[in-house]
UniProtKB/Swiss-Prot annotation:
Compositional bias per record (Acidic residues), positions renumbered to this chain: 347-396
Family the UniProt entry places it in: Belongs to the transposase 22 family.
Origin organism lineage: Eukaryota, Metazoa, Chordata, Craniata, Vertebrata
Domain of life assignment: Eukaryota
Protein name per Swiss-Prot or TrEMBL: LINE-1 type transposase domain-containing protein 1
InterPro entries in the cross-refs: L1_C, L1_dsRBD, L1_RRM_dom, Transposase_22
Residues recorded with modification Phosphoserine: S136, S407, S409, S442, S478, S490, S559, S567
Keyword Phosphoprotein: yes
Pfam families with a match to the protein in the record: Tnp_22_dsRBD, Transposase_22
Organism: Mus musculus
Statement: the UniProt record of this protein carries the keyword Cytoplasm: no
Basic and acidic residues: compositionally biased ranges: 11-27, 95-107, 143-158, 183-194
Residue span of region Disordered: 1-30, 90-200, 338-397
UniProt KW keywords: Phosphoprotein
Amino acid sequence: MSGVQSKAARLQKERKEKLSADRERKTATSLCLKHSEVPASMMKQFNALMEMQEVMFAEMRETYKNDIKEMLLKRTAPWVKHLEERIGQQEGDAISERPKPGEKVEELSSGTDEDTENLTVRSKKGKQDKAKPLNSSHVLKSSLERGGEALRGEHGRCGESSSLVDWKNANEKPAREASCQSEENRLKAPKESPPEGGAGATLRLAADFSAATLDVGRQWSQVFRLLKEKELEPELQCSVKLAFKCDGEANVFSDLHSLRQFTSRKPFLRELLKDVFPQNEGGRRNELRERLGKTLGDTKHEARRIASDSLSFLFIKEVEVASPEVKTYKEETLDRKNKGTLKKQEGEEEEISETQGEETSEGETSELGEEEGSESEEEEESSESEEEEESSESAEEIGFISLVVDSESEEEVNRKTASQTKKKETFHGLKELAFSYLVWDSKKKKLVRCQEGGAAAASTQRIGMPCLTLYLTSPSESLGAGSDGPKSHSCTKLSALSQVTPLLTNIEKGRYKVPQTEEPTAKEADLILETEENFKRGVISVIRQMQREVDKIKNIYVSDVLNMKSSLDDLNSLACTIEARVSEQEDAVEGLTKDTMQLAREIVDKERLREREDRFRSSNIRVIGIPEKENRENGAVDIIKEVIEENFAELEDQSLEIVSAHRVPNSVDEHRLTPRHILVKFGSASDKQRVLKASRAKQEITYRGSKIRLTADLSPGTIDARSQWCGIIKILQDEGFQPRILYPAKLAFDFKGKTKIFFDIEEFKKFISDIPYLKDLLNNIH
């Protein structure tokens, strides 16, 4: 078992590593472009594909894990761990809550399972020489120990406890009697009245199917109940198909989809079953499970979930077993040695599979377990002549099983007998197999073996005591019978069924004993190897499919990617060109900025020079209009004194100081039409201002009868700036606005009793635009 688990763990680890390596390789090949170059839509599709791959791998892992768990659970009792965990608690509860002899124990109805006995079906495939003979008492003890453990676990969950019977030691008779009395009370607890005379016992026979079969058949539970209430004679076949009669015609359905299609044409059935059909079916997970042929009900926890639903009544029947004419186990063994008619059964029962039951909180269906052994070494020695018959019949597979249960009350005996006869006619010559089972004898206070077989069983049963009859056939006969018509029955997929052992579970007084597990056989090893190979092939196929899908996506988008790549190259080249141009413009702007700054600095420097020059010339006056010949005869200083005496007599008393006077420029230009200016420098700026003020007051200034003009000596820049106001000053002066120039080149004039000052012509034009009178006067000035 540890070898199988280690193989499964190693296989899972290798698979994860392989998936990780393949994913990295695919990612490296598919994402050849940078993330920034791939459009968002492609990345979303690729991410969605990777998520789908992850989901698919996860579902495959769960599916294969369930397969391996199912295979391992067949070799190990699923209730072993639960028994070990609850040993301490349940032993104390069993001792403290053990009922007294004769006390009636109340049972809690779970709806699906009430102290049932598991009918274990296993196939006998090994030959006689491979069987391992075991002592008959050991086989009985082991079987009873298993049944006792399962029943004890069930009572522990329901809050009940019963006496324990130890079959290992024959000397503990008082303990056995107390346990037998408790067991008799437990069997009388169900709602059905006990059989008359107290000689019988109520058994529940449960067909043991795999968890996957129960998961598939669970969908029929409510449909079966509703059809049964309407007396439509539903029948659950072994292949989990639903059959019932409607309008006098038998109908067989294998799934709910076919039943839904049929009921859509029958208003009565559609109204009856409208609450049964599931509303939402499908989904990716169900689709994958159908493709892989697996279900999630094959695990131990899912098996518990299945057992908790209302499906159990389809496979479990309670029967009453008559016990007045039964024989003890020892007597039965001696009779089988002497009777030739029972030799065939003796050979078929050489290998008895022990039941392996799984505990659940609400009742459960048992897991199939097998333990090879014989009834006793003495029986094997006495049945050497029967081994040939057994070896020839052991290879025959049971193709069909039908459980025919008689009615549970005397009022339904006739109807059930007719129905049973009718069902037997549909079996197409199936074999009737004798079998034996253990029942509790309340009189003898012990378990006795009861053997029934075909017609003999019917003769030994009294009225009102139903018995179990098994019909077996080979696969070829069952296939032939199944092809006759709608009355045919389908074969179950249980592997090589050969025995049916109704076993009354006994309980043990001492500790729980965990049965020893056997090493995996060659067939199981081959099965494990085949499972691993199938897993590898499935993973490889999925990876190849994903690779094909990725290649397909790459082929679809490769042209678009190439176009986008070329477009990106063009955009990159264009961006480079634009970047170069922008760089050039930035360089030009930087150069212009530098030039602007240089010009600004030059302007500032010029302003500073102009201001200095104007300050240096602040005490100078220019005399304009004196002819050149006058300069030769008289000096410039004398000319200025003569002008002051002639025009400004009031200034003679103020003692104006004339520092210097000369014509500018120094050189004489023969082509010059006007005479050169005489530059007069006074001792102070105040003297200059008194002379200019007197010249403004006297409108006309002359020198020896010729008209001259006196102005302040300014720098060339200041003179150019003031020259823009010449035309405006003339017009304003004619209109009487008294215009004047303020230093360095500002226009000032009186308007409506206020002095208006303007720094440039644009500001002056904006002002006169709101005054129509001035606007009309200055319209011609640009």
